[in-house]
């Protein structure tokens, strides 16, 4: 493991030039102090965990100091926001400090969010508040622990710098890690501003740096697009299977790598509600939980439009058409596993859809249902869960079909089923009320709850003694919280 001054930089994106980003220095925040750090995220940079305890660590990730090799850049992009094209967005408060080349041969972007004003800040102050920084940190690391592809968060640094949102808050910075920060909107910007040479340069960069194996195909850009479609189908299947609602699926928030990216008013489901809207600005429900699948496909179509100089429209349409069947296959496989099933059968989609409708009608806690279903032998678990449902007879019919389905597999003991189910059904998820409790403590200067919650979320499938309070249904005030985009 390395010290902070031993990191190796190879700033590939910065070398593309000023058509793609603008050199900007971070604006430091006052009295920086570390709120929380992720040891596993820092390990991606080969950074020893004790480095986060040094004063230099907080100074670097609050904008006070920089490596000589860093080349901070604000990236330019556009995007479709709530379905309407916005011609010029860009990093309004975040900076790509540089790319670290680790000992495993990987490049990791260091993106400092809340780093101050840039040419793309529009009327904003370029700051992020402590509240949103903690939420992004916890969400990134929670999704990663669940096995859902995501950008990572290495740390949060707080300050005494006041900023105004609905009220006075304090500025913070979060260090985000990803192997690329190129978005769908990065390519859209160059396409719609009619910069064909720069569009080709960026497309080549994505192809050679992130999809090099596609270069061997007869149509490299089509092969790359197909893999992006495949990755997004798998990503959205995992969101839906684990009850994650992103909240702002604009094309500028979609990663070219098919990872969860740009956290805002996200939420995990408490009670199952397919129509759940986590963003209080989403008045029409465009980005509701159930709409995430069609919106992802719509966003892929928007990306495909930007690739029309390199791939035929017919081939792009055909590839986009693969999204839904790929999604359905991934989703059904995940839901089978959540139910403890190991063999695919034709009626599995009906078994799943009937269960979800029952949960919807009865307001059943989505996460705890699956965990409790695996806690005991099936017959006992179903009896214990029965009282959670309004229509007992319909639930009993479903339970009978489920037990028959388990019996048909004949592939092991109840203990083996329990172990299988506990390996894929988390006990701990990032419920909004848990995040809110941690934020309120942090805003008073107490960071212990953020750190404790982070540690719990790092091992979501394993029961942790003394942490029972993190595995409960939310109190009434904590249910169905809608979160503001204000950050």
Curated annotation (Swiss-Prot):
Function summary: Nucleotidyltransferase involved in the post-translational modification of proteins. It can catalyze the addition of adenosine monophosphate (AMP) or uridine monophosphate (UMP) to a protein, resulting in modifications known as AMPylation and UMPylation.
State which Enzyme Commission number(s) the record gives.
Answer: 2.7.7.-, 2.7.7.108
| Family note | Belongs to the SELO family.
Return the InterPro entries for the record: SelO (IPR003846)
Which Pfam families does the protein's record reference? SelO
Binding locations of Mg(2+): 253, 262
Q: What class of enzyme is it?
A: transferase
Q: Is the keyword Methyltransferase in the record?
A: no
Which cofactor(s) are needed, names only? Answer: Mg(2+); Mn(2+)
Write down the chemical reaction(s) this protein catalyses.
L-seryl-[protein] + ATP = 3-O-(5'-adenylyl)-L-seryl-[protein] + diphosphate; L-threonyl-[protein] + ATP = 3-O-(5'-adenylyl)-L-threonyl-[protein] + diphosphate; L-tyrosyl-[protein] + ATP = O-(5'-adenylyl)-L-tyrosyl-[protein] + diphosphate; L-histidyl-[protein] + UTP = N(tele)-(5'-uridylyl)-L-histidyl-[protein] + diphosphate
Protein name, UniProt field? Protein nucleotidyltransferase YdiU
GO molecular function list: AMPylase activity; ATP binding; magnesium ion binding
Source organism per entry reads Pseudomonas syringae pv. tomato (strain ATCC BAA-871 / DC3000)
């Amino acid at each position: 493991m390395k010290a902070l001054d031993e990191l190796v930089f190879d700033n590939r994106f910065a070398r593309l030039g000023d058509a793609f980003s603008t050199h900007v220095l971070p604006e430091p925040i006052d009295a920086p102090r570390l709120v929380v750090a992720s040891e596993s995220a820092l390990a991606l940079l080969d950074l020893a965990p004790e480095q986060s305890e040094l004063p230099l660590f907080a100074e670097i990730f609050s904008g006070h100091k920089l490596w000589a090799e860093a080349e901070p850049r604000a990236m330019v992009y556009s995007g479709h926001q709530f379905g309407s094209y916005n011609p010029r967005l860009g990093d309004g408060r975040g900076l790509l400090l540089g790319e670290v080349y680790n000992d495993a041969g990987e490049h990791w972007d260091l993106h400092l969010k809340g780093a101050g004003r840039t040419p793309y800040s529009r009327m904003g102050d370029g700051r992020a508040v402590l509240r949103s920084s903690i939420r992004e940190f916890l969400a990134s690391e929670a999704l990663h622990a669940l096995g859902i592809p995501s950008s990572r968060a290495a740390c949060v640094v707080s300050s005494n710098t006041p900023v105004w949102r609905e009220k006075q808050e304090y500025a913070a910075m979060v260090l985000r890690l990803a192997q690329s920060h190129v978005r769908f909107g990065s390519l859209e910007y160059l396409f719609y501003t009619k910069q064909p040479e720069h569009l080709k340069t960026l497309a080549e960069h994505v192809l050679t740096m992130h999809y090099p194996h596609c270069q061997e195909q007869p149509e490299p850009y089509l092969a790359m697009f197909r893999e992006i479609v495949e990755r997004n189908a798998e990503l959205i299947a995992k969101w839906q299977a684990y009850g994650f609602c992103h909240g702002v699926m604009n094309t500028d928030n979609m990663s070219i790598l098919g990872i969860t990216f740009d956290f805002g008013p996200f939420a995990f489901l408490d009670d199952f509600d397919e129509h759940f809207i986590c963003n209080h600005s989403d008045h029409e429900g465009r980005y509701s939980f159930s709409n995430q699948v069609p919106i992802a496909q719509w966003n892929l179509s928007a990306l495909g439009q930007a690739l029309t100089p390199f791939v035929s429209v017919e081939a792009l349409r055909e590839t986009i058409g693969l999204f839904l069947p790929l999604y359905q296959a991934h989703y059904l496989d995940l839901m089978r596993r959540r139910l403890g099933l190991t063999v695919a059968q034709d009626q599995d989609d009906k078994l799943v859809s009937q269960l979800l409708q029952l949960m919807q009608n009865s307001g059943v806690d989505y996460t705890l249902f699956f965990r409790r279903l695996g806690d005991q032998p099936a017959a006992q678990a179903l009896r214990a869960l029965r009282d959670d449902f309004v229509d007992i007879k319909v639930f009993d019919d479903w339970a009978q079909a489920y037990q028959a389905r388990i019996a048909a597999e004949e592939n092991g003991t109840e203990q083996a089923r329990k172990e299988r189910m506990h390996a894929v059904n988390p006990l701990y998820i990032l419920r909004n009320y848990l995040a809110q409790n941690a934020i309120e403590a942090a805003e008073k200067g107490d960071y212990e709850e953020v750190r404790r919650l982070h540690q719990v979320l790092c091992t979501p499938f394993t029961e942790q003694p003394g942490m029972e309070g993190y595995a409960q249904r939310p109190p009434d005030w904590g249910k169905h919280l809608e979160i503001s985009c204000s950050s």
